[in-house]
Amino acid sequence: MSKRIEYIVDEILDQYMYADTSFRPWIIGFSGGKDSTVLLTLVWLALRKIKRDTITPFQLRRPIYVVCNDTMVENPIIATYVDEVLAQIETKAREEDLPIFVRKTEPKLEDSFWVNVIGKGYPVPNTAFRWCTDKMKIKPTARFIIEQVDECGEAIILIGTRKTESATRARSIKKHEVYGKRLTNHTILRNTYVYAPIKELMLEEVWYIINAIPSPWGFDNSILFNIYKDASADDYECPTVVTDKSHGSCGQSRFGCWVCTVVKDDKSMRSLIKNGREWMKPLYDFRIEIDQERNIIENRMPYRRDGRRAINDMGPYVFSYRAKMLRRLLEVQHDLQKHDPKIKLISDQELIAIQVNWYRDFNFGYQVSEIYNSIYKESFNMEENIKNKLEADLMKEICFENPEEGELIEQLLLLQRSKSLMQRRRGLKNEIESRLKEFVNNKKQ
């Protein structure tokens, strides 16, 4: 282990034990990429050193949360890899009795990508309208951090940002760092501090740690190395300092959402396909398709969702295009499941929420279940409890100013369902009329 790496481990140890005597939690943002992997590796080594060199376990009372945000549209290869790594981290932390705990965050259902694009008609993001970052990345993790601050008073976020990543990263670090101080104030969240232990590491050192130091949680780091190698585009060159001459160029590949239309081209996915993952090509083609169709005027409504005229008549997607996109998405999912049945590009909850949003926008011409059934040749099972919850939420929103009318509608729906279950529709019309008269009479009193 190099002197610089030993120094970082000792600095982390000092910050954990001596520089900060409180027990405010550490929160490590973990993506499964090279930098967050190295950060967690060095923190783990520091904790092992504390446990080895101290007499009492009291020194390890500060909790460390490994927080991974799932946007629900992650690259399937990365998503599978990260899930396996997180499971191994949790298992090994319990075996070694370390205060490391895995937490996964994800956007709320109404903030998910497909509910917004297919359900509400949001145009797919671009550089001018990048609505996805806040809804799908920032908010979910921020909610977890705020919960920790509310419970503990303060929290410290450990990030794997490095100065040599880019000129932009270097400027950002320099702007916020305070000379002689390890911690800086979070720019947005109150009572939250930021610690960047590996900010001075070079890319060569990052790969050295991954390839030369065994994963503390027992995972095979060569898997990560090979993912980066296969995802490296031709115009990238990775300056590798590794222990085995068989390691070639691994690139500086960046992984994001597979459906991201903010970038012009998904070079990492294109390279993965080129290097043997041909089954991913439908994903790549679908992303290009929805990007190219974004600004076709026939695909857009002339009005915004709030009723105002849209600029250049480019409002939300029309319902026919939303239905077309859903059909194409499910076709791609069905195709990918021939390679791996576990792959899901859209969840059942999202499908239900899309239908609810279509009803909310008075679209009754397209049915999610019909689209699904035409592709999978089987009935789409809308879990009754989820369906009922979404209906109840919708009812509360619509009848916010007149809750008694919402109660009436619920009663009428229950009446209709009970008759349907008993297969006795006779008398339903009379009972509905009777209930309506009773409601009107009560209102008059």
Model feature map: region roles:
Residues 33:
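Catalytic cores of secreted/periplasmic lytic hydrolases that degrade extracellular macromolecules
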